[in-house]
Amino acid sequence: MDEARARDVLTAAGLDGGEPAELLALGENAVFAAGDLVVKVGREAALLERAERELAVAAWLADAGVRAVRAAEPAARLVDGHPLTVWHRLPDAVRPAGPEDLAALLRHLHALPAPPFTLPARDLLGGVERWLRLAGEAVDPADAAYLRARRDAYAGEVAGLTPHLAPGAIHGDALPRNVHVSPDGPVLVDLETVSYDLREHDLVVMALSRDRYGLPAAAYEAFTRAYGWDVRGWDGCAVLRGARETASCAWVAQHAPANPKALAEFRRRVASLRDGDPEVRWHAF
């Protein structure tokens, strides 16, 4: 799904309004700002269930007093084969979100009891096949086969982990980019990966950011201080990190057919995994 296709879906849904909607992000979802609303258009119909669950999560967090994005419509729509959800637009951010902002929201989320509906386990590796399928012939078949084999190996290892923290609700993609600092304080956004699983999933993300994406050591230390624990001291950290690296690498593949920079970054990531080099920096594209 490219931007033009996503805009066609907006038009079909009657949400393009008078002013052209502003594209905020384009990945598995196209995210648009349309007046005082934010509209998320999913890549394919198979993501409808996830969109519906994200709305249920938002309502649950509102009831629990967690500062998180709020839905403007209670149900997801399916428009021309694409799931679509509508959200209240947040005020402009007063500053970039920091590690401490994320840690505080995670502490609140991780303290909650289970919601009154079933959350899935964090299927960290579940998107690998879909992303590689979307990549098609743009990526080397040997690289795709390598990632599939790596996925299968890590799936078994993750299933056998013994957690340090009590399992429960997690965000699933816990990064500062998924926190919006509004005038009233930090707000958790992008709730589609909220799951019920090892709390360590949410903490390994920042550890990987330190090692792969250039997060300064001081920023990572601020995160662990604010949360109260450093996941790197846990025996299972390397396994969760390896699984997330596999997923993060495959995620880039879906963008390779239309984006030469994404293809170059995909190749870079695969090479670093093949070489077993944990210090090669990964980049946005």
Please provide the spans of the model-predicted regions.
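Conserved NTP-binding catalytic cores of kinases and kinase-like/nucleotidyltransferase enzymes
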Residues: 1-69, 183, 283
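A short, glycine/Asx- and small/polar-enriched loop/turn
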Residues: 28, 33-36, 79-83, 243
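ATP/Mg2+ or Mg2+-diphosphate-binding catalytic cores
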Residues: 130, 134-138, 142, 250-285
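A cross-family kinase active-site recognition segment
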Residues: 93-145, 165-167
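Active-site acidic catalytic loop and adjacent metal/ATP-binding pocket
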Residues: 25-39, 71, 155-203
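Active-site activation/catalytic loop segments of kinase-like enzymes and analogous catalytic loops
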Residues: 200-231, 243-258
